[in-house]
């Protein structure tokens, strides 16, 4: 029997959080090996564990996978969260790439200069309301089904609900005019595996604060 997937990253959201979400939603228990210093990261680099000298890295099925999207694709395929055929996978890819664009803006927000932060938040809110939320509301409206693709849970639904929580942290009113997105968030959040992940004490990570940001700076030296 294969061991649990082992996640190598620092103790924060960053680019590992979507992987945590997807594994949790699939009902997969995993271990986390936190990188606590630049020396820890250097050791992984020096022993050949990181193909491109970068994390996240996930040990799974005898592999040391890097690159967030590659890891997500593998997990989604392994746990039947990637559609039934090539057309459904194309839709899932298209939707998740769109989500990734907005998620990247939110991910980088703590790194911006203080004098730029308000403008960045305003831009995120504007794009959320005018571009991203309307697009996904329209998808759900177009087929009247419970999930984005094939009327079956996929990584696209998990990624979207993760994103909805992040947007809610910025401004909880942004979702108010999108009833189908609200319903999707409730539906996915009530799945037993996701509900467990949303509880206190789970591997889910909180928003980055000044302490977490300083820790990341020391590890990654940016």
Swiss-Prot record:
Catalysed reactions, as listed in the record: RX + glutathione = an S-substituted glutathione + a halide anion + H(+); androst-5-ene-3,17-dione = androst-4-ene-3,17-dione; pregn-5-ene-3,20-dione = progesterone
In-chain residues carrying the UniProt-annotated modification N-acetylalanine: 2
Cell compartment(s), UniProt: Cytoplasm
An annotated Gene Ontology molecular function: glutathione transferase activity
Record's GO cellular component terms: cytosol; extracellular exosome
EC number from the UniProt entry: 2.5.1.18
Binding-site positions, glutathione: 9, 45, 54-55, 67-68
Keywords for the protein's UniProt record, in alphabetical order: Acetylation, Cytoplasm, Lipid metabolism, Transferase
CDD domains recorded: GST_C_Alpha (cd03208), GST_N_Alpha (cd03077)
Main localization (coarse): cytoplasm
A single BP term in Gene Ontology: lipid metabolic process
Residue ranges annotated for the GST C-terminal domain, each copy included: 85-207
Residues annotated as domain GST N-terminal: 3-83
Residue list for modification N6-succinyllysine: 4
Family: Belongs to the GST superfamily. Alpha family.
Oligomeric form and interacting partners: Homodimer.
Function of the protein: Conjugation of reduced glutathione to a wide number of exogenous and endogenous hydrophobic electrophiles. Catalyzes isomerization reactions that contribute to the biosynthesis of steroid hormones. Efficiently catalyze obligatory double-bond isomerizations of delta(5)-androstene-3,17-dione and delta(5)-pregnene-3,20-dione, precursors to testosterone and progesterone, respectively. Has substantial activity toward aflatoxin B1-8,9-epoxide.
Protein name, UniProt field: Glutathione S-transferase A3
Organism, as annotated: Homo sapiens (Human)
Lineage: Eukaryota, Metazoa, Chordata, Craniata, Vertebrata
Gene: GSTA3
């Amino acid at each position: 029997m294969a061991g649990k997937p082992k996640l190598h990253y620092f103790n924060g959201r960053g680019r590992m959080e979507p992987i945590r979400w997807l594994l949790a939603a699939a009902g997969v228990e995993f271990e986390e090996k936190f990188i606590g210093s630049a020396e820890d990261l250097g050791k992984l680099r020096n022993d050949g564990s990181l193909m491109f000298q970068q994390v996240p890295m996930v040990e799974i099925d005898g592999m040391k996978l890097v690159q967030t999207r590659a890891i997500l694709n593998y997990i989604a395929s392994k746990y039947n969260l990637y559609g039934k055929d090539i057309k459904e996978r194309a839709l899932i890819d298209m939707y998740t790439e769109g989500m990734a664009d907005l998620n990247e803006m939110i991910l980088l927000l703590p790194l911006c200069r203080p004098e730029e932060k308000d403008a960045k938040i305003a831009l995120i809110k504007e794009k959320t309301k005018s571009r991203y939320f309307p697009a996904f509301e329209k998808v759900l409206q177009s087929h009247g089904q419970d999930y984005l693709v094939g009327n079956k849970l996929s990584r696209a639904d998990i990624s979207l609900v993760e994103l909805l929580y992040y947007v809610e942290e910025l401004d909880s009113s942004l979702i108010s005019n999108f009833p189908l997105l609200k319903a999707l968030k409730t539906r996915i959040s009530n799945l037993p595996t996701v509900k467990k992940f949303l509880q206190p004490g789970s591997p889910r990570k909180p928003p980055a604060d000044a302490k977490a940001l300083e820790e990341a700076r020391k590890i990654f030296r940016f």
